[in-house]
């Protein structure tokens, strides 16, 4: 199993930014303007109870049920936000511990991530308090070759344990951006979506299949 060296922290005094959430996700792009924005399809994926659906609700303004029992997210939920000049489609996939095709949820997720409608990027939400267990799924996503950004969620609870790990170093080792978040309040989401836009812009510059103007409804 993946293990991290933990040590008592000289933790940063302000580990998370505190943005005004309402200023982040502009939903004023209505009518024809929204239909001409480039679309970025992002799949939300993480272990059960990692805070993934809380992130979905905070970002999209949706009110999906959030609970601590199996089967809360039994199918993909979709929400939309407009940020950084893009129309972002958020797909909240079922919670899963792995991509091994054993359970119906795992088969559904793997087929979605590798099929013709696969997302442009995967936002992997992890419970920072259980980082080793959560990284198993992260490494499987990396093996699929999809662009990944990690939200280190519940970072406040992790810091309360007076532990710290060098997540910038881990990010460099894995080649995956990692951003601390507190999804239930929205803290860290501005930095997270800025990173997502940055990664998306850097993916194969000139690849027209990544961003396609919205031509639907």
Where are these regions (language model features)?
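Extracytoplasmic
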Residues: 212-217
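Conserved nucleotide-binding/hydrolysis micro-motifs of P-loop NTPases
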Residues: 71, 95-96, 128-132, 154-159, ...
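Canonical P-loop GTPase G-domain recognition
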Residues: 156-211
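Conserved C-terminal guanine-recognition region of P-loop GTPase G domains, centered on the G4
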Residues: 79-85, 108-179
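Conserved G1/Walker A P-loop phosphate-binding module
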Residues: 2-103, 115-121
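Glycine-centered helix-boundary capping/hinge motifs
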Residues: 60-61, 145, 175, 186
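Helical mechanochemical/support elements of P-loop NTPase systems and associated helical scaffolds
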Residues: 70-77, 89, 101, 105-108, ...
């Amino acid at each position: 199993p993946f293990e991290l060296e933990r040590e008592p922290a000289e933790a940063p005094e302000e580990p998370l930014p505190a943005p005004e959430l309402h200023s982040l996700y502009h939903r004023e792009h209505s009518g024809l303007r929204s239909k001409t924005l480039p679309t970025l399809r992002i799949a939300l994926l993480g272990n059960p109870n990692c805070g993934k659906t809380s992130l979905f609700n905070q970002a999209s303004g949706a009110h999906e049920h959030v609970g601590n029992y199996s089967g809360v997210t039994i199918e993909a939920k979709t929400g939309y936000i407009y940020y950084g000049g893009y129309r972002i489609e958020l797909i909240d996939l079922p919670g899963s511990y792995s991509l091994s095709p054993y359970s119906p949820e795992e088969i559904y997720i793997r087929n979605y991530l590798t099929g013709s409608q696969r997302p442009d990027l995967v936002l992997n939400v992890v419970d920072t308090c259980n980082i080793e267990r959560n990284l198993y799924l992260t490494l499987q996503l990396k093996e699929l070759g999809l662009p990944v950004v990690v939200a280190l969620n519940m970072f406040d609870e992790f810091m309360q344990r007076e532990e710290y790990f060098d997540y910038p170093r881990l990010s460099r080792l894995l080649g995956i951006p990692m951003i601390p978040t507190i999804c239930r309040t929205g803290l860290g989401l501005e930095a997270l979506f800025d990173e997502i836009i940055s990664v998306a812009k850097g993916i194969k510059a000139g690849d027209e299949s990544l961003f396609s103007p919205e031509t639907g409804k």
